[in-house]
Regions:
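Histone-fold recognition with a strong bias for associated Lys/Arg-rich disordered tails
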Residues: 1-183
Length: 183
């Protein structure tokens, strides 16, 4: 596993997962921490993939919180160590990226790997009806044939939806004022 093959956002999520483990005083860095970091993302890529796959993000979050509360807590200034299941998720994500023709491991591949590797995170995803196949179909729909060929690949996904307004959709819903005086 080479973290240099991960996109900037994917690296950030791995670091966020470690921060979650430290904040919760957990001894081990688990796939559940990574899934929590993905779901709590302010840009919501993982949450939108889950929603597009007809999954319930709130249900996953509740299940995750109950799993994380059961983890062993340690006192003091202890760095959590990476659990073998966490490392397996990262390896699986790298394998998935290679199979799909990506040069970098993107965030969505981390989510797919979480749905594949046996862990509490997989149980949380399954509790909301999420499978790796559903996530993959959502990824293919979102990417529209593009691959992750740069360290900032996720920034290009759904750029139009992020930075533009769909005036036709807004007009159909009656959210814009009618144009008066049109010739």
């Amino acid at each position: 596993m080479d973290l240099n093959k991960f996109t900037e956002r994917a690296k950030g999520f791995v670091q966020n997962a470690q921060s979650v483990a430290i904040r919760e005083n957990h001894q081990r860095l688990l796939p559940e921490h990574l899934l929590k970091a993905l779901i709590d993302d302010d840009q919501g890529l993982a949450a939108s993939l889950i929603s597009n796959s007809e999954g319930n993000v709130d249900e996953i979050a509740l299940f995750l919180n109950s799993l994380l509360e059961k983890q062993v807590k340690v006192k003091g200034n202890v760095q959590p160590f990476a659990d073998p299941s966490f490392l397996k998720v990262l390896d699986e994500a790298e394998t998935l990226a290679q199979k799909s023709g990506d040069q970098f491991v993107a965030t969505e591949r981390l989510l797919t790997a979480l749905a594949m590797v046996k862990s509490g995170a997989k149980e949380a995803l399954l509790s909301a009806g999420m499978t790796s196949q559903k996530i993959n179909s959502s990824i293919n729909e979102m990417r529209k044939g593009r691959t992750a060929d740069s360290a900032s690949a996720e920034d290009n996904y759904q750029a139009l939806e992020k930075y533009a307004q769909d005036l036709t959709h807004a007009a159909r819903e009656g959210k814009i004022d009618p144009i008066i005086g049109r010739d």
